[in-house]
Every structure is written in C-alpha cells, then in structure tokens.
Design a protein with these regions (language model features):
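DNA major-groove recognition helix of helix-turn-helix/homeodomain DNA-binding modules
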Residues: 77-95
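N-terminal flexible/basic segments that precede or flank functional cores
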Residues: 1-41
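Helix-turn-helix DNA-binding elements, focusing on the entry/boundary residues of the two helices
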Residues: 52, 63, 78-81
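Short basic helix-loop element that most often maps to the first helix and adjoining turn
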Residues: 39-56
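Short amphipathic alpha-helical elements of helix-turn-helix/winged-helix folds
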Residues: 24, 44-45, 87
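Recognition helix of helix-turn-helix/homeodomain-like DNA-binding domains
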Residues: 60-76
Length: 101
C-alpha cells in the first residue's frame, strides 16, 4: 500500500496541483492565521520537488536557514517566502476578495 507521503510527492510533481496545494494553504492562512500549517505545506512541497538542499541552491538561501524558517517556530520574511516559491516555479499573485454579482 502506497504511503500518503509518497502519493503526495508524486502528485506535487504536477505544476497545477503544486500551485493549487500552495494556494489553498495560503488562502487558509489568511482565514485563520495558522502560519505553522502554511509553513508545513511549503516544506512538504519543497521536499516533494527535490528537497531542501536543491531548493536552497535555487533560492539562494542557506539550507540550515530554510530548516529553521520552516520549523514550527519558524520566523520568515516575505522575501524569503517569495524566493522559496520562485525556486518551486511559483509566484505570489493577489486577487480581489470581493465577489461581483
């Protein structure tokens, strides 16, 4: 039986699924301000897409700093989040919270 982590790693190889996964976590963060959940989701995506060592090189952020940033007590800057997302092939975008009828 396939482990969930293996299943998730396989699914996150798809660019659209990866983007949706991160977007859902980010949108949830804006609802409940659960930073730990967002950082855990980002860490899962990084591991699925080659690991922290690979992403640290692409993001130009020290590997140990990424481990610390993504820990449950991690404190990260907006710039570092952007760098990690860019290394994953993603970017932040904004959209209106208003629903037009």
């Amino acid at each position: 039986m396939e482990k969930f982590t293996d299943y998730l790693k396989e699914k996150l190889q798809n660019e659209k699924i990866l983007a949706g996964y991160i977007n859902e976590a980010l949108e949830q963060y804006f609802v409940d301000h659960n930073k730990e959940l967002f950082l855990a989701t980002l860490k899962e995506a990084i591991i699925a897409r080659g690991g922290i060592a690979k992403i640290s090189k692409e993001a130009h952020i020290n590997r140990q700093h990424i481990y610390k940033m993504l820990s449950s007590k991690g404190n990260t800057s907006f710039g570092n989040i952007g760098s990690l997302l860019n290394a994953l092939g993603l970017q932040l975008k904004s959209r209106s919270m208003c629903v037009l009828n």
